[in-house]
């Protein structure tokens, strides 16, 4: 076998299958268009709707190199030669086209003729009942029977993913590395009896059955092929190395880690594990952040945070005490950027998000580890409540807690941890409100097969349609004469909530009745459901109706949607290309846009963005809409949000010279129809994500009117011209502060301040106050000494769960008493620190509840 680089292998695979009539498609996003999955875990994920029979394929033969991410075995990453979080899966797929014979023959041809793998190095396994696959391998390929292993369902039968669904036998191809560890003495080594010698390099799944509720298998009318081969394993095979980490996919990254840490690879096994963990995790981190996933405490963001913090901890084991992961990103981009340009575009963003997260974790890790050690010292174990507190309060992922505990030989009880986690998630969901997509809409099964609602809302706001289905409380009904029901019409001009844009509202009318359309949504692909409230008459299945969209509401929404595209473009121009959409809301009264950026916008930047958007509005640029393939759209430079499916015809909305995005929403005909754009707020949403809210058109006009009314009221109240308002308000604020200070000091001075006389006759005046700022306590102490003439004054103030104190000693007592020493003594008792001069000192503490004890032992602290 000749040495082949990862680039050569990737290209050879795709070219081979292109010659076999396959459509070569780009990798889909790591973020799947599938609510059941957090990440794309296999090459077939983008094609699930096709495998499940929900969508007709555009191409019957497809080949891809798919980005994938799995964390199910994350604790093994770094400890084995082949476990990874991020990996690339090569795959060829057939949707009702070729089947077993071609799939097996082409896999063999690619391995032996294109890659040049010696036949004697290859073994296969088949499902024990799959005689057809056995025959193809034995008779067509000519593989000896002893090299075809018959395996059970656990090893060689795929699916279904749930209790029911598509499934089928598979055949696996193994490569013999020659590594002899684990082979039984006196027996020939095979993939079934050796440990580590044979590596599974390719899995060919023959999806030919459907499993029903009783577990019975039924032949599928259309049989499919789904194959997957790990690029990393192909590289190890073709580059003559045993470990994937020794391939050209990882070596440049490992070299960079060696430079940064000063630790050589393959010098110490424990350190090698840490280097491999970092090399693996930095790839996952780079790709996830570049696709808009940011560290958080739930969902994908939590997985990313786990990966970052695990990599950081292994960096600490290598002696790193400062952020370093962000400095490895360029090695990943240099190696993989040509194949995946999204990481080139997002490099700056990845580094900034990662650097911020590293700094945040380093601040909490020290505190978290201190608490960890305290718990272990006290209990000898970490129970579920402790583990959850370390996660929730100190940011230590459970997996990290488990890993550290294992290293320290400490028992961890995690049985109840998930209950704490589920309760937190339940509260989070409750706070978010009812989530529409959580429903199953089983009543849609009553629709005709392959039914799709005809959407006409791009061209018109009024249309005729027919009632296809009526549902109440998730059950279909033939008619409805009152209350709220969900209805599917044959066609509709009503836009369903999607892509951040809220749904249309309006009216439905028929011969003897009418209903209010309250909400519209797409319950499954292509099926639009309208939630309506019947106002008059009886609505029946088959009824002819007229559907009228609320024109003013739709037009306001259109203004805001096009303005959102302009805002996105303006932010990129003002802040940089790292800006990516991270969420949006397009409503009739306002727009909200979440985007990636790492600090708040200055007033000047906000003005720049506003000016740009309003310039484009005043130019009245025509808004163009066209349909094209996803590939062509991406080639033309369109902004994509990683949610489009393979093969789909996509809708491109373009403002020439300004913006070009994939979008299914409704838009104005030209930018001039937006009228006016005004930002009303800019704030942080989470680490690395900012949010802008803005208004357009009549909402912007209303905002300006209200601001004018407010200014007029202030002018009248303050008796000032508009250009004098700022100075007048600042002057009043200073006067109020001064009056509050005098009032506070005057009132407090009049309060009863306790006095205690020491054995030497010295009087100690003390008092405890609520909410008095530290800067005012000194003035109060001055007032007390002025009134009393001499003595020691010790004053406390409880303020926001903390305590402040001042100590003042009159001049005649300075030879015997030191205010600085007294303040330090008391502060130590209160869990804080302090100091100052001999005659005046200040201090603070974290335990205001200990003040009473201090006063009872006051003389101790004066020594």
From Swiss-Prot:
Binds 1 zinc ion per subunit. One of its GO terms (molecular function) is aminoacyl-tRNA deacylase activity. Its EC number is 6.1.1.7. It comes from the Bacteria. SMART domains: tRNA_SAD. It is found in: Cytoplasm. It catalyses: tRNA(Ala) + L-alanine + ATP = L-alanyl-tRNA(Ala) + AMP + diphosphate. InterPro entries: aa-tRNA-synth_II/BPL/LPL (IPR045864), Ala-tRNA-lgiase_IIc (IPR002318), Ala-tRNA-ligase_IIc_anticod-bd (IPR018162), Ala-tRNA-synth_IIc_core (IPR018165), Ala-tRNA-synth_IIc_N (IPR018164), Ala-tRNA_ligase (IPR050058), Ala_tRNA_ligase_euk/bac (IPR023033), DHHA1_dom (IPR003156). Zn(2+) binds at residues 561, 565, 663, 667. SUPFAM superfamilies: Class II aaRS and biotin synthetases, Putative anticodon-binding domain of alanyl-tRNA synthetase (AlaRS), ThrRS/AlaRS common domain, Translation proteins. GO terms for cellular component: cytosol. One of its GO terms (biological process) is alanyl-tRNA aminoacylation. Keywords: Aminoacyl-tRNA synthetase, ATP-binding, Cytoplasm, Ligase, Metal-binding, Nucleotide-binding, Protein biosynthesis, RNA-binding, tRNA-binding, Zinc. Its cofactor is Zn(2+). Catalyzes the attachment of alanine to tRNA(Ala) in a two-step reaction: alanine is first activated by ATP to form Ala-AMP and then transferred to the acceptor end of tRNA(Ala). Also edits incorrectly charged Ser-tRNA(Ala) and Gly-tRNA(Ala) via its editing domain. Consists of three domains; the N-terminal catalytic domain, the editing domain and the C-terminal C-Ala domain. The editing domain removes incorrectly charged amino acids, while the C-Ala domain, along with tRNA(Ala), serves as a bridge to cooperatively bring together the editing and aminoacylation centers thus stimulating deacylation of misacylated tRNAs. PANTHER family: ALANINE--TRNA LIGASE, CYTOPLASMIC, ALANYL-TRNA SYNTHETASE. HAMAP family: Ala_tRNA_synth_B. Belongs to the class-II aminoacyl-tRNA synthetase family. This is Alanine--tRNA ligase. The lineage of its organism: Bacteria, Thermotogati, Thermotogota, Thermotogae, Thermotogales.
């Amino acid at each position: 076998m000749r040495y082949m680089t990862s680039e050569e292998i990737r290209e050879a695979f795709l070219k081979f299958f292109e010659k076999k009539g396959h459509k070569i498609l780009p990798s889909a996003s790591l973020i799947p268009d599938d609510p059941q999955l957090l990440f794309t875990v296999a090459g077939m994920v983008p094609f699930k709707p096709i495998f499940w029979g929900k969508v007709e394929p555009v191409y019957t033969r497809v080949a891809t190199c798919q980005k994938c991410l799995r964390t199910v075995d994350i604790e093994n990453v770094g400890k084995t030669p082949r476990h990874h979080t991020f990996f690339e899966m090569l795959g060829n797929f057939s949707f009702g086209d070729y089947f077993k014979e071609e799939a097996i023959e082409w896999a063999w041809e690619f391995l032996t003729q294109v890659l040049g793998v010696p036949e004697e190095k290859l073994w296969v396994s088949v499902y024990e009942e799959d005689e057809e696959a056995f025959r193809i391998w034995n008779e067509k390929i000519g593989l000896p029977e002893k090299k075809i292993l018959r395996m059970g369902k656990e090893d060689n039968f795929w699916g279904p993913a749930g209790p029911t669904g598509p499934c089928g036998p598979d055949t696996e191809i193994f490569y013999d590395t020659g590594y002899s560890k684990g082979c039984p003495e006196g027996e020939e080594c095979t993939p079934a009896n050796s440990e580590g010698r044979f590596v599974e390099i390719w899995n060919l799944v023959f999806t030919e059955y459907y499993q029903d509720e009783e577990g019975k298998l039924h032949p599928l009318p259309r049989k499919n092929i789904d194959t997957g081969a790990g690029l990393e394993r192909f590289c190890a095979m073709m580059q003559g190395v045993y470990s994937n980490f020794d391939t050209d996919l990882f070596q440049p990254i490992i070299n960079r880690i060696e430079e940064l840490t000063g630790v050589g690879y393959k010098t110490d096994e424990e350190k090698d594990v840490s280097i491999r963990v970092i090399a693996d995790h930095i790839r996952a981190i780079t790709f996830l952040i570049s696709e808009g996933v940011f560290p958080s405490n739930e969902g994908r963001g939590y997985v990313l945070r786990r990966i970052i913090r695990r990599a950081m901890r292994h960096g600490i084991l290598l002696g790193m005490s400062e952020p370093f992961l962000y400095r490895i990103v360029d090695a990943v981009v240099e190696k993989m950027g040509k194949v995946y340009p999204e990481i080139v575009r997002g490099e700056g963003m990845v580094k900034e998000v990662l650097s911020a997260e590293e700094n945040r974790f380093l601040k909490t890790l020290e505190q978290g580890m201190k608490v960890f050690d305290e718990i272990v010292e006290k209990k000898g174990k970490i129970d579920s409540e402790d583990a959850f507190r370390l996660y929730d309060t100190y940011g230590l992922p459970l997996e990290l807690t488990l890993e550290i505990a294992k290293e320290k030989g400490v028992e961890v009880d995690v049985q109840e941890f998930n209950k704490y986690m589920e309760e937190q998630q339940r509260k989070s969901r409750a706070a978010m409100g009812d989530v529409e997509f959580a429903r199953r809409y089983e009543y849609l099964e009553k629709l005709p097969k392959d039914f799709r609602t005809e959407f006409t809302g791009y061209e018109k706001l009024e249309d005729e349609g027919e009632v296809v289905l009526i549902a109440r409380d998730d059950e279909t009904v033939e008619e409805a004469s009152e209350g709220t029901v969900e209805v599917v019409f044959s066609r509709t001009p009503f836009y369903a909530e999607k892509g951040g844009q809220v749904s249309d509202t309006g009216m439905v009318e028929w011969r003897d009745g009418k209903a209010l359309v309250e909400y519209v949504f797409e319950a499954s692909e292509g099926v639009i459901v309208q939630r309506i409230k019947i106002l008059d008459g009886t609505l029946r299945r088959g009824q002819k109706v007229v559907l009228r969209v609320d024109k003013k509401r739709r037009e306001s929404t259109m203004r805001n949607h096009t303005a959102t595209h302009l805002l996105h473009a303006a932010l990129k121009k003002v802040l940089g290309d790292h800006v990516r959409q991270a969420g949006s809301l397009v409503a009739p009264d306002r727009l909200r846009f979440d985007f990636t950026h790492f600090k708040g916008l200055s007033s000047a930047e906000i003005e720049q963005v506003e000016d740009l958007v309003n310039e484009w509005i005043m130019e009245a640029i025509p808004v163009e809409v066209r349909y094209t393939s996803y590939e062509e759209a991406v080639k033309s430079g369109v902004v994509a949000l990683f949610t489009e499916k393979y093969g789909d015809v996509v809708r491109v909305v373009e403002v020439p010279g300004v913006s070009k995005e994939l979008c299914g929403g409704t838009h104005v005909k030209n930018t001039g129809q937006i009228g006016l754009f005004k930002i009303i707020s800019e704030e942080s949403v989470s680490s690395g994500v900012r949010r802008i809210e803005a208004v357009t058109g009549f909402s912007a006009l209303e905002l300006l009117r209200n601001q004018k009314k407010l200014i007029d009221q202030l002018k009248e109240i303050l008796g000032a011209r508009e250009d004098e308002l700022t100075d007048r308000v600042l002057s009043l604020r200073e006067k109020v502060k001064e009056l509050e200070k005098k009032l506070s000091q005057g009132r407090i001075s009049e309060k009863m301040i306790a006095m205690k006389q020491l054995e030497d006759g010295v009087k100690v005046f003390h008092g405890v106050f609520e909410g008095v700022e530290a800067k005012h306590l000194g003035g109060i102490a001055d007032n007390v000494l002025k009134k009393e003439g001499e003595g020691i004054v010790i004053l406390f103030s409880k303020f926001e769960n903390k305590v402040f104190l001042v100590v003042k000693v009159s001049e005649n007592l300075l030879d015997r008493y030191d205010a600085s020493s007294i303040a330090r003594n008391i502060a130590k008792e209160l869990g804080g620190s302090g100091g100052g001069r001999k005659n005046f000192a200040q201090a603070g503490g974290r335990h205001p509840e200990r003040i009473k004890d201090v006063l009872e032992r006051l003389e101790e602290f004066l020594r």
